[in-house]
Each structure stands twice: as C-alpha cells, then as structure tokens.
Design a protein with these regions (language model features):
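Hydrophobic N-terminal alpha-helices or hydrophobic patches in metabolic proteins across all domains
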Residues: 1-121
C-alpha cells in the first residue's frame, strides 16, 4: 500500500519514542509520541514511522486515524500523522495561537501549529 493510501484509515501504532523522551542519537526531546506501524515496510526499509498528535501523555500503543503524510524530500522516510479517531483537529499557521505546548485546545477544538510539527521533524 502506498503511504498516501493510509489517509483516512484507522491505524494501530507501536510507540517506541514516547512524548517527552530523548532521542537516542541526537539528544532532542520528542514533543509528541512517535512510533511505527508493525509489519510494514517504508522507503528506508524499516517500518512506516508515525507522529501521534493530540495525546498529552506518554503512551506505548495507539489506534487512531491517519490525517496526513509528511513527505521528506531528502530521503524515502515518509511519516504518517495519526490523531484520535473521535476528535476534530485543525492545522494552523497563526502567530495568534501561542501555546504553552505544541498542542492547544481552543473552543473545544485542537489546534496544532505547523511550526511545532515542523520543529519535531
């Protein structure tokens, strides 16, 4: 299945780098839960990577809906963006939203600033 075919599908993700954990080689802190889809193969020969957004605590496993594919132009290691299946989310590029964390709830909706997502890649 092509990575774009995951959009709109319910996906099971195994988290191997929890929210707040430190990257094993580069030393940065993960602002989101990060994992992979077991038993899949991506362009880099490993499992397909996923960012889990909208979950505010470290987790081990997650099932949610794929809303986007982040295509990296310098390699074949695309990332899927997975969210809780029962929530509404909006990607915004606005300086008017200055969250304490990369994710903020406003009027019952989740806003994920594009800058926060880009910084985590």
């Amino acid at each position: 299945m092509a990575n774009k075919d995951y959009i709109g599908k319910i996906i099971g993700v195994k988290i191997d780098r929890e929210l707040g954990s430190k990257h094993p080689k580069h030393g940065f802190i993960y602002p989101v839960n990060y994992g992979f889809i077991p038993n899949t193969i991506s362009g880099d020969g490993e499992e397909i990577d996923c960012y889990v957004l909208g979950v505010f605590e470290p987790i081990k496993d997650f099932t949610g809906k794929c809303i986007a594919v982040i295509h990296r132009i310098n390699d074949d290691d695309d990332k899927l963006v997975i969210i809780p299946k029962d929530k509404n989310y909006f990607l915004v590029n606005s300086d008017s939203i200055k969250p304490d964390s990369p994710q903020k709830i406003v009027n019952g909706n989740m806003y994920l600033p594009l800058r926060a997502i880009a910084d985590s890649i």
